[in-house]
Amino acid sequence: SFSDSCASSQTQLAKVSVDREIARLAKIPQPEQRTQEWYLARYNLITASNAYKCLSTATNSEKNSIILEKCKPLVILDSTDSSTCLETSKNIEQSTYVNTESPLHYGVRYEPVSVLYYEWFYSTQIGEYGCIPHYKYSFLGASPDGINIKRDNNRYGRMLEIKNPKSRKITGIPKSEYWVQMQLQMETCNLNQCDFLETHFSEYDSYDEFLADGSFQMSDDGYYKGIIYHFKGNGKPHYEYMPFNATQSEYEAWDKQTMFKNQEKEWLETIFWKLDNVSCVLVERNKQWFKDNIVSMGEVWDTVLAERVTGYEHRKPKKRTNNDVSKQTTIKQYNEPLSPSKVKRTSLFSSY
């Protein structure tokens, strides 16, 4: 019909537009995520993850925090941890220590599993990108977790933002700073949609416990299962991920290949996981929001540039005096631990 023909033409035009943007992004030099070069590239940028601190609605404390972060010397903990930002490339301090038990590292460790799940569930392919500068505003940038690059998939051109909270409850509603982060990502890449994927993983104590819970691929309560190998190489953690939803025979073949490939590394542990909570919601680009906030972000960046020259000492936290400490009131907090049995599955998948 005529209406179907029009819809098909619009779809093709949309794909051509996505083709153009993905080709543009592919030409941008992109250092690997969380490498020293990646952190250096982020130095001269307000990135999507901290842009919420630059808005007109941000508190003075938040603005002070981002300005200080962008002025003080950088300490790179390692290629899988967070950092502050550097003053000059000569001021880099580097440490190989990695806290693999931190909530941050938990998210880093499981992000590839989340991507594998997303690709498998939606029959798509995710392209990975480094730190991408805004095409118009040179002080803005973003490091998306990925973009759908399978052209015959209805999610073609849709961005992907992943969060793996270790303890925070998954509600399906992005926190305001995450929403801002995705708006900056879409604005930087000039794409109009982003899937906000939240996943939570629990871990088995042993291979026997893993095998006893349902089938090799699925738990008794209907959750996907999988395996990660944790190695140490050059003093840093290295992970290998079993293909998503692999059978036991496929796992055994993967095991041999993986151990052979990593024979120069030290094997530390095998992690048996269960994906016990998933939420995926669509976030649309809001161009008017960006127009309303670009001035505020620019003003914060102008302050950063000025104080890199004039000094930023006044931004640092003030040391408390003995008199300040004596005025503090001790507050007791009572936290009731949640039973694992109370964990709910959030099912928000839709055919958008």
Give the residues covered by each predicted segment.
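Accessory terminal regions of nucleic-acid processing enzymes
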Residues: 1-352
